[in-house]
Amino acid sequence: MRLQVGLLRLVTMQQIESHARLTDSAFHANRDRMQQLVAELRAHRTTAREGGGAKYLQRHREQGKRPVRDRIERLLDPGAPFLELSPLAAFGLYDDEAPAGGIVTGIGRVAGREVVVVANDATVKGGTYFPITVKKHIRAQEIARQNRLPCLYLVDSGGAFLPLQ
């Protein structure tokens, strides 16, 4: 069945028939493993969202600064979604001392327009740039260029992380 609505054409597809046997032990083993992997993924994302950790977040607040995701939320239009890009950048790198690569990047809406946001997380090594940070930053800019979106930068950075330069 096809339905034309203005320029949008809706096409209904046939339902894909499942051949999974819900009583099969392999099905249960796969399901259990997938649930374990999803739980691990959620834990890694939570760790990345915590940035440099409670100690550095507290120090940041004592300096009168807002956490990176709070700054982003205040920048975006009220209720606007934020699609974070590469939240697990640097996972398993640098002894896990650069959660999310030290920056938060994503797509959100400001003044009614979609934008790419690049924001340093100063709780991660003072917002300094690791090699993966540079890659993540450049990738966000490429996405902005390809989609003709303006970039907004929330900078709170100590420059390059010198031990890795």
Where are the model-predicted features located?
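Terminal-region recognition feature
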Residues: G6, L10-Q165
